[in-house]
Amino acid sequence: QIEQELPVAGDRWPWGDPHRYPHRPHPVGGNGEIFLRGTRALGIEARVGPVAIANGRFGNRPHCIYRGFCLQGCKVNAKASPLITHVPDALAHGAEVRADSMVTRIAIDRESGRALGVHYVRDGRERFQRAAMVAVAGYSIETPRLLLNSACSRFPHGVGNDFDQVGRYLMVQGAPQTAGRFDAEVRMYKAPPPEVSTEQFYETDPARDFQRGFSIQTVSPLPITWAEHVAAQGHWGGALREYMSDYVHWACLGALCEFLPQPGNRVTLAEEKDRYGLPVADFSYSQCDNDRAQAKAAQSVMEDILHAAGAGEVITIQRYAHLVGGARMAGDQHSGVVDQFCRSFAVPNLYITDGSVLPTQGAANPALTIMAVAARAADQLAAGARSGSAS
């Protein structure tokens, strides 16, 4: 459903749930050509896409014009984003956006345990919005923070936190990026960043010394980010200028490693308070040996691909991406915060519809999964409203 609504363009995907995408794959740029050349030389299977960028007209959105710099926005709106897809549709169907508002807590009825609405601050005034149902989408730091800050007589340790699950099992993906220099110009910015991907290393392989796996895709750090990459290698002054003037000769790959969920990686409330007088989030995080082994293996594969494609110098920067978890989906309230429909175990008319509900990280960009999970929750919420169970 979401792939049709965005829409998604790409090759037929052979991994996971093999299927075709609504739009055909985009032409491959220099970075993608290098990735495909290296993977072919090593016998690694790779595919173009998937990306949520129109390859052909879609409604009032035109075909991608391949101007590059996709991470800074899309001049012609070929690239999907909520601002040009679901938000306009929601507004057209009666939704109201109250910008510059800060929700301070969820109001809970002491007797029934149901959510009554939310308290929020806007234009310096405290306000209250009554609601038959409440959906929280503050993401993996702010959603647990709001639940914890909503402690009340019914939930003295925070909403939905009777079993100390709120804020736990936060995850990031290991996301090292490895770049290689080529004699010919590459111009890696001239294509969608995740242009070509492989998930050949995604699943657990008993031959490896770690569980789960990683994916690899082309990435296209723009000049400012490229300068940060180079500076992280210790280059400065004249050496940094030389790397920057050579920018168009570099190709860059990125891995997404499925770091494991750990209960000690969590959000709690700090003593420090924000401008609204609310405790800010405190984030505790550490890696396990399995995480470190994954990232090391991913870096090795990326180096092999670039060398097989003909790279000379190769450099790597260690980085992380895609925070998820903190209000995870589970079979019961002893091990999570919401059920399979993103509905709170503790508060029957409270939903959480963001990446904090993911129980594991996966080794791919999580945006489409988050959107699909939220869409399923919306269907469930709407069905409840129609049947009268929302009241």
Give the location of each predicted region.
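Hydrophobic (often cysteine-bearing) scaffold residues that line and stabilize catalytic clefts
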Residues: V28-N31, K79, L83, Q294-A298, ...
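A glycine-rich dinucleotide-binding beta-alpha-beta segment and adjacent secondary-structure elements
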Residues: G49, F58-C70, N77, T104-D109, ...
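Conserved redox-cofactor binding core of oxidoreductases
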Residues: Q1-V103, L323-R328
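FAD cofactor-binding and catalytic pocket of flavoenzymes
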Residues: E33, F163-D282, S335, F345, ...
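Surface-exposed helix-capping loop/turn segments at secondary-structure junctions
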Residues: Q4-W15, L42-E45, D109, R187, ...
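A conserved FAD-binding loop/helix module that cradles the flavin
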Residues: T360-L381
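Generic, well-ordered alpha-helical scaffold segments in large soluble proteins
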Residues: Q1-E5, G38, L42, D89, ...
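Glycine-rich loop(s) and the adjacent beta-strand/alpha-helix scaffold that form part
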Residues: V76, A92, S101, R105-E111, ...
